[in-house]
Swiss-Prot record:
Component of the ASTRA complex involved in chromatin remodeling. This is ASTRA-associated protein 1. InterPro entries: WD40/YVTN_repeat-like_dom_sf, WD40_repeat_dom_sf. Belongs to the WD repeat ASA1 family. Component of the ASTRA chromatin remodeling machinery complex. GO terms for biological process: chromatin organization. SUPFAM superfamilies: WD40 repeat-like. Its main location: nucleus. It comes from the Eukaryota.
Amino acid sequence: MATKVTLSEYTLRFHKDAVTDVKTVVDLTNFKVPVLISGDGSGKLVIWNVITRRVQFVYEIPKSPQILAIEYLGDLLVAVLSKDHKLRILQLQLDESKTLVKTNEQSQIQQQLYKYNIVFEVPVNTLNFANFSLEKIAPEEYRLVCCNTQNAESIDIYAFKLNRLNSLKRLNKGINFYKTVIDLLRNTEISKFDKLGIVMKFLRVNDLVYCGFESGIIICFRYKLRQEVMTTKYNETSSKQSKLQELIKSEDTDISIYENMLEIVYISTVHYPNPILDLSISAKDEETVLSSSTDSKIGIHKAQITNGNVSLPDNEGYIIDDSKQVIVRKTLGADTSFVEVPVTEIGSIKSLKCGMVLGGWNGKAIVVDNNNEILKIVGRTKSNILVNESAIRSIQNDSDSIIKMKKNYKIKAVDGIDGVGTDISQLSNISRGDQRRLDKFLSSSWCIVGFDDGCITLDSI
């Protein structure tokens, strides 16, 4: 078991402000090599070649707002959410001219390998630092789940098409799950909580969206474009009915049609009352989600879908909220599945097949195996700080009163990839040396950590 912080194998230095998000992308069709996409506190989006460890692309958001979240959508599309309350989607394209740009204050010149076009931009509430969820529902068409524009305890859902700024359509507005959920939890030990709190994290898993809240509650829902609920107004008084009575009965059957409804399919209270800090798809089961909080629990979540995305025949077994936007089975209970890990205050989590990367508030990233044994500890220590234990002795300049204290840089984001082992012999425009380094990189698992001093570390596991 590892007990000490190890010296990182590689350190990427470009950002002058805190690294706020990192995403590793292995898309050899479009990027040719694995890349790392990083964002920082001054609005810089950077794409790195992780084989050469060099910057390939830099995009600076106007007025330098902090970048909150990054998502790679495939096909060289990158979504970026920033503190100027905007979600931007960039379409990258290989720049044959390879424009030269200044990449840092030391006036180093770097080739800009990509050019970009902003293919969509939408205002998003970022007062609570939550991220967003994007789902591709048709070619160049997406569904967005984000915080409500006025209340960060509620969510909005939009649909839009790329390259058509006037295509934005709000499907649902101000959805708050509290009243629906409290009815289900009324007879449980946590039934007295008065609100879910602000949304902390979104995570999409296929057609499901997990929402983690400040209260520690996790809710998973699926989107239903059309929902039919059948009720019968006819009161049967006799078992023998004429043809006319049967006709009247059929006419008295009322079918209510609801559009754009959300069905809650899963609830977890495992972290209550501690806030949800991060969510990650399990690398061992892509239908399972892991969660972290301020405690030492890693929540395990898997929604069980029983009836598919179909209309329900009646509403007897379901609760429909007053807004007619949310539906849930009356028998749905709360899950509390979790595993214990040897750390607390886990601000970031990334699941790997070999274990997990856990980014702690203490400035240390812990890599644990599948038995939750610590494999590696990653961190960056600031220069020693001299501290005087006594004000009187400091006047006397007594060296015995001086002690050395070390402080870690804060961790802002973690990521990781499993060794994939792929055939790279067919890749063009890559030297034998780069092929060898690429093969070595892809055959290993990696832990990537972004720190508040602007550095990004890469360590093999």
